[in-house]
């Protein structure tokens, strides 16, 4: 199980201090949710903040775009060499083209599926994907409660996309992490405040 702490759960008044606290910890990547209220009702980080974070942290960065038209960000992101870029399947008109654009940044490419989104229609992209992320809570900002039935979706992802790395994101507690790992999730984005941001 590889953990990825989410910067969106840090205290926004103390990002610098909380990033420094992570310097000597071992985890997969620092995870940034990019939201502009066009897909979900929240706003997180702009490009200036992302660039500042990239300058300060020694850790690789993974990005989860929860917005319409994520492609607008890719040219600027290429300068900081992200490790992963995930985009929501629900936002894409031409997913294969978008995945190619992600790879041009130097990042590995992944799709994200909301809890209600079936995965079967996306199997044709299996050879173009490095990762698949399952949202394990509704990304609505209303408590981020873990949905246990998403463990079944994790199992389906492992079958449908056997060559990709399987991620889970949303409401993940220690107990939920154990369930998800048993279902086959390899990477987990954690609600980091109680775990790392102390």
Language-model-derived ranges and their functions:
Residues 2-7, 30-32, 61-65, 83-87, ...:
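Hydrophobic faces of well-ordered beta-strands that scaffold small-molecule active sites
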Residues 6-13, 63-71, 91, 112-119, ...:
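Glycine-rich beta-to-alpha transition loops that act as phosphate-gripper elements at the mouths
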Residues 17-22, 69-79, 116-128, 172-188:
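Catalytic cores of alpha/beta
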Residues 25, 56, 80, 105, ...:
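Structural motif
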Residues 31-101:
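N-terminal active-site wall of soluble small-molecule enzyme domains
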Residues 36-44, 48, 115, 121-155, ...:
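Glycine/Thr-rich beta-alpha phosphate-binding loop at enzyme active sites
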Residues 43-65, 101-114, 148-167:
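Alpha-helix-loop-beta-strand connector modules within alpha/beta enzyme cores
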